[in-house]
């Protein structure tokens, strides 16, 4: 979805110097649109997911600035704890904060490029 949307923005002549995408796939689509339309870099591109593809791009090119890694495992564990509280009638909080991590060129080597964070 990002490739045609970003292509349209470029063709409409709207100037931009950054893309913050909904997820890593969209960030990669935005990058493809920028390259396909031969827009001059640098344009800062960020994604969300900590996907293997984004980590490879981070470690091998200057095209991507970063990705925010969420932890589906931590989220799932928290959800299961809340479900258990609901099931047993125990109290639980309305909101939970689950930390995320910014992965960029300075720290991508600390993450496995073959897996999700």
Feature locations, PLM:
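Hinge/cleft segment of the Venus flytrap/periplasmic-binding protein
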Residues: 50, 71-117
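Short beta-strand elements at the ligand-binding edges of bilobed clamshell
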Residues: 60-73
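Short, well-ordered alpha-helices that flank and scaffold nucleotide-derived cofactor binding pockets
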Residues: 32-36, 60, 81, 85
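Generic structural signal for alpha-helix termini and adjacent loop/cap motifs
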Residues: 12, 61, 86-90
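Short glycine-centered helix-capping/turn motifs at secondary-structure transition points
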Residues: 37-38, 62, 115
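Hydrophobic alpha-helical
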Residues: 1-55
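Extracellular/periplasmic bilobal clamshell ligand-binding domains
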Residues: 54-57, 87
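Structural detector of well-ordered beta-strand residues that form the stable sheet scaffold
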Residues: 44-46, 65-68, 103
């Amino acid at each position: 979805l990002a490739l045609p949307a970003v292509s349209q923005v470029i063709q409409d002549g709207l100037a931009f110097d950054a893309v913050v995408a909904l997820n890593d796939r969209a960030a990669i689509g935005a990058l493809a649109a920028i390259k396909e339309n031969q827009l001059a870099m640098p344009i800062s591109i960020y994604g969300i997911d900590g996907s293997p593809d984004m980590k490879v791009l981070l470690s091998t090119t200057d095209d991507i600035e970063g990705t925010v890694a969420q932890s589906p495992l931590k989220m799932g564990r928290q959800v299961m704890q809340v479900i258990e509280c609901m099931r047993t009638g125990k109290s639980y909080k309305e909101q939970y904060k689950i930390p995320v991590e910014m992965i960029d060129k300075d720290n991508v080597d600390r993450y496995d490029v073959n897996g999700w964070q």
